From Swiss-Prot:
This is UPF0182 protein Syncc9605_1323. It comes from Synechococcus sp. (strain CC9605). Keywords: Cell membrane, Membrane, Transmembrane, Transmembrane helix. It is a multi-pass membrane protein. Belongs to the UPF0182 family.
């Protein structure tokens, strides 16, 4: 029986390994999983080496007989203090090891900065923490349990080292950047990849050595005889040599950490300088260099025979250095730096500006000054392509309308609405902007009686279909217009005569097909398909249309061995007793696309909301083939997931915010996930990023160059709004190149505010279709207006290009500083001051009706600026928004109508001749 119990963990591990292997194998990436396993086994073996050394040290220490008359012993209060210190250190080091273990299991890539992720923000609850303290205390006092405490700490140490394979791999694989930091001369790759590995290695070695030394001392001091006598047995000379040996190792490790702390100064904010300033360069760095030398000498003094006075002198010198850094640093800052701060800090401010611009790709911005004229009929004619695609539907109101008009059943959910573009009008040089929203299955919305095990895992397995709406059109009743709506055989595909778009073009460019969505944004439980039980596909009137999964994705569980492994993996014994599973059945797991791609590439940070694309002929020809593993059915729907590499240890780069410590960020990976089969491909969008190049070096079969991305998918690339927002945030202060202007702070920008739905919010970036200087064709752009700090007038805007070879390029349009250009908040005030508009708003916003002013857009049209704001009406009870009016302004006059062109006609009539 005992042997069976010992075999049980092995059975669980074997089952999990089999399911993971089969899951990776469906993508032909089993070699990636095997490499990760081998790395973890190798690291576990490496971690065993210091543990074996610690065990040998402990064995040597215990072999020496302790006496009460020979050697060094402690009595009275010194003994009591030593006993207390040992108890506290053993408790803290054991708790810290368990916290590191918890972090290594939950998110091992956070261990590179474990100090800010473990304490004080421990991931273990207070009750569990109390249980841990009680258990450790019991093991320390109960002689029979004491060896188990050491074994648990040692095993935890091995698991932590093994689980952090990503940190060690990045440190080994990252290539040199060939750019050095301006103060210490280290290659930038040291901070981006190697520092975390070195620091963690020293931390773990120090933690292990500390626990080993103090645990053995505690074993001696806490013996029943010692406590009874309130005196420790005497330590023999050999034991003292062993103690000095391990103490010297601790000093050498501390010297390494102090040396590395010199580099930490380069990515720590010091006043205005995002890194080491004059004070750190001329005082802190030398002091820490001397401290490193003293720690090394102290370690050598413990190993080599020398006089006691020398050791005391070295300890006193180290204490003096610590006092100097603690006390002299603020005095020097006050007496020396503050009186002539800019003169001393100019060089370091320049370093911070250049590093921050490089860290967030602000150095690639192309700047130009534009002096916009007043909007005129000529601008209206020249900017026709921009006006054709003005977004009058915000994502929020359209999503709410979708939920009320197109969810169709209680268990469907539209979780997001993404702006995209499709070439629907062959007579136009620009693509049609649309909002795409996927209809996913939300199992949490199933009625309670329907939440049976069979329903959740065998029948309700997938969502179905999506809606596509033009951003610039509405129905006569004010509700959204649709190119695609409905689902199943009742899916309606329509053109739009007002936009010059025919139904055939919509069918060609946005194919629907059998739009079953087995993978999506919403968290979904595992599904088993196909089985002998038919799956719910979509409703058709009062009838439910059923289907069977025909995709290539999933883990095969047709054999009994596979089914047993799946039951163990999911902790679901019912899989063993159901008669529904057949030889073709597969287990579909990790159906949330973000967790799906994260499981394969945990070293890439997948942020933001994925967005759905639907493209034609995705599998015809090698250049357009997305799902290379499936020949069962033609699939049109795919999810695009944005992946990032980031670092908080780039020298002199400023952190994004107090809550976001990133000092380096790249949108380096784009993952494409088949919404039906679940297949995944990873494309590298930043080939010059040293971090992603490290992972390419380690896993060459995982990544593909952007040139390998099918053209149909490449046409739907977008600069992620998350990444763009970070760039805008850093640009607000770091758009200047002159350290004097930066120091004075007289050219700081901010994101403007607007009133949306009665609340004051920051203006979010929005997509427009417009021409960029030097390109005669209109492009799909992401735009963010900017205003001076504490002033509402417009000062600049940042534009990200999304089309073709210009993808990712940034254009900064500066407006003349001597000219007043109204910002969004000022234009909204102008709108409310217009008597006709104000009167109409007052008539609407009363009783059961609620008026919602949408996002105010500032648009470059021709050589002028045009402000456009949609106005929605909704009842307070039902909340179905309808587009009531469109307000336009040229910055002086305001006009409003039900149609954009009619509103522009009114504006032109009001405007004096130019």
């Amino acid at each position: 029986m005992r042997r069976l119990l010992l075999l049980l963990p092995l059975v669980v591990v074997a089952a999990r390994m089999q399911i993971e292997w089969l899951w990776f194998n469906q993508f032909n990436l089993a070699n990636v999983l095997l490499e990760r396993w081998l790395l973890q086994v190798l690291l576990a073996g490496v971690a065993m080496l210091p543990l074996l050394a610690a065990r040998a040290w402990s064995r040597q220490f215990r072999q020496q007989r302790l006496t009460s008359s020979q050697g060094i012993s402690l009595r009275g209060w010194p003994y009591g203090i030593a006993l207390l210190i040992c108890a506290v250190v053993v408790l803290i080091s054991a708790l810290l090891t368990l916290d590191l273990l918890a972090l290594a299991i939950s998110d091992p890539f956070q261990l590179g900065d474990w100090q800010s992720n473990v304490w004080p923000h421990s991931r273990i609850g207070s009750v569990v923490k109390l249980v841990q303290v009680g258990g450790i205390g019991l093991a320390m006092t109960w002689l029979r349990l004491r060896p188990w405490l050491g074994r648990i700490v040692a095993a935890s140490w091995v698991v932590v080292v093994s689980r952090t394979w990503g940190i060690w791999s990045l440190a080994l694989w990252i290539p040199n950047e060939s750019t050095k930091d301006p103060l210490l001369g280290a290659d930038l790759s040291f901070g981006l990849g190697r520092f975390a590995g070195l620091h963690l290695a020293l931390d773990l070695l120090l933690l292990g050595a500390t626990f080993t030394l103090v645990f053995e001392l505690w074993r001696v001091l806490a013996s029943s005889q010692a406590i009874s006598d309130w005196a420790s047995p005497a330590f023999s000379p050999r034991q003292m040599r062993l103690i000095r040996l391990l103490s010297a190792l601790l000093l050498f490790g501390a010297a390494g950490l102090v040396w590395l702390s010199r580099h930490q100064l380069l990515w720590t904010q010091h006043g205005l300088v995002a890194g080491a300033g004059w004070l750190q360069a001329h005082m802190t760095l030398p002091l820490r260099g001397f401290a490193t030398l003293l720690l090394l000498l102290m370690g050598l003094a413990l190993l080599l025979p020398c006089q006691r006075r020398l050791r005391q002198f070295l300890a006193l010198a180290l204490a003096t250095l610590v006092m100097l850094e603690t006390l002299a640093t603020p005095l020097t800052r006050w007496l020396v730096v503050r009186p002539r701060e800019f003169a001393l800090q100019e060089r370091y401010l320049k370093n911070a500006i250049e590093a921050t611009q490089w860290g967030f790709q602000l150095d690639q911005i192309k700047s130009q000054v534009d002096d916009p004229s007043r909007f005129s009929p000529t601008d209206r004619e020249e900017g026709a392509s921009t006006l054709e695609n003005v977004r009058i539907w915000d994502s929020g109101p359209l999503l709410e309308a979708n939920r009320q008009l197109q969810q169709l059943r209680v268990y469907y959910r539209f979780s997001n609405a993404a702006v995209d573009r499709y070439p629907l009008n062959q007579d136009s040089d620009s693509s049609q902007q649309v909002i795409v929203s996927a209809r996913e299955l939300d199992q949490s919305a199933l009625p309670r009686r329907s939440k049976t095990w069979q329903n959740r895992h065998f029948i309700f397995t997938h969502g179905y279909g999506f809606t596509v709406s033009p951003v610039n059109e509405r129905r006569d009743d004010g509700l959204p217009s649709y190119f695609i709506k409905g689902l199943g055989t009742e899916t309606k595909i329509a053109g739009n005569p007002a936009l010059g778009i025919e139904r055939s073009e919509v069918e060609k460019e946005i194919p629907v097909g059998d739009a079953a969505l087995y993978y999506g944004m919403l968290p979904s439980p595992y599904a088993v398909a196909p089985t002998d039980i038919a799956e719910f596909d979509y409703p058709e009137g009062d009838i439910n249309v059923m289907t069977h999964y025909q995709g290539s994705g999933g883990v095969p569980i047709g054999t009994w061995l596979q089914r047993c492994s799946a039951a163990v993996y999911l902790r679901e014994p019912r899989l063993l007793f159901t008669n529904a599973i057949n030889a073709d059945s597969k287990l579909l797991i990790r159906r949330d696309v973000r967790s799906r791609v994260k499981a394969i590439a945990p070293f890439i940070d997948f942020r933001g909301e994925p967005y759905l694309i639907s493209i034609p002929d995705a599998q015809q020809g090698s250049s357009n083939r997305i799902n290379q593993n499936s020949n069962q059915r033609q699939q049109h729907q795919y999810w695009v997931v944005e992946g990032y590499t980031h670092s908080s240890t780039l020298a002199y780069s400023a952190a994004v915010s107090p809550d976001d410590s990133d000092r380096y960020l790249r949108n380096s990976v784009k993952a494409i996930v088949d919404a039906y089969n679940g297949s995944i491909r990873f494309f590298v969008s930043e080939p010059e990023d040293p971090i992603v190049n490290a992972w390419i070096r380690g896993f060459p079969d995982l990544f593909e160059p952007m040139q390998a991305m099918p053209l149909l998918v490449r046409d739907h690339r977008r600069v992620p709004e998350d990444f763009f927002n970070v760039q805008v945030n850093q640009l607000k202060r770091y758009h200047v190149d002159d350290p004097q202007i930066f120091y004075n702070g007289d050219d700081v920008w901010q994101v403007p505010s607007e009133i949306y739905g009665g609340q004051k919010i920051n203006v979010e970036p929005y997509h427009i279709t417009a021409q960029v200087q030097g390109n005669n064709n209109s492009e799909f752009l992401l735009l963010q207006p900017l205003t001076p700090l504490a002033r509402p007038n417009l000062t600049a805007w940042l534009v990200a290009r999304n089309d073709g070879d210009h993808y990712g390029e940034l254009e900064l349009i500066d407006f003349p500083k001597d000219k007043i250009i109204l910002g969004p908040e000022q234009v909204q005030a102008l709108i409310h001051q217009d008597p006709d508009v104000s009167e109409q708003f007052g008539l609407w916003d009363q009783d059961d009706l609620e008026l919602v002013q949408g996002n105010l857009l500032v648009l470059p049209v021709g050589s002028g600026l045009l402000y456009v704001e949609p106005v929605y009406l909704r009842t307070r009870k039902v909340g179905l928004p309808s587009l009531a009016r469109i307000v336009v302004s040229d910055g002086r006059l305001v006009a409003m109508d039900q149609d954009l062109n009619l509103a522009l006609d009114q504006l032109m009539k009001k405007a004096p001749p130019v």
